[in-house]
Amino acid sequence: YRQCRDLVAPYLDGCHLMDALSDYAFAEKGIVSNPVAAVQHLQPFLDAGVSPLWCYYSGAHGCRDYTGRNLSMPSARTRMIGVQMYLAGIDGFLHWGYNFWHTKFSYDTVDPFLSGDCGGFNPSGDCFLVYPGENGTAMESLRLHAMRGAMEDIRMLELYESFFGRERTEAMVLEIAGGTLNFREYPTEERFFRDLTARVMTDCAGK
């Protein structure tokens, strides 16, 4: 990997060299300057204070405790990635599989209305967030709305932080979550987001 990187790096001066990782060694040795860690492998990156640090969750589908966007998951579990990213100080999210309506390696196409798992490639829902509509348009899924909610949650918490500071914001989130919220342990019910939004609106009303 290092040899391949060194081969092309001189031609990419000034560009961001990013890659999706599961092994911290690539960041530790400086082979990848902008690592994008899978959520189930994030902890070593967080412990080392890697910055900038992005995350993604495709590939975490075999890890039942982690968030994702599988059809079998409640929307609250999909949406949770935003609050998790805020608390962990993650800089960005790698989003793949917007409209991947193919089998593994794209050998064939699939009908996403009939095959949510892309011919057995990944768990249903992992490979796409939209469905084909008329005249080349995209039909949004509920999972896409949940992902938008996740990004809006980050903006909401950043606004709260601008009024009350980081420490109080984190304490408020953890209080509503029942004391614990990380990438492996987190609320999975919609009520958490209703309570969180209500608290933010109430506290910020006079600002």
Q: Where does each model-flagged region fall?
A:
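Catalytic-core regions of glycoside hydrolase
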Residues: 1-106
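Catalytic domains of carbohydrate-active enzymes that cleave complex glycans
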Residues: 2-23, 90, 106-207
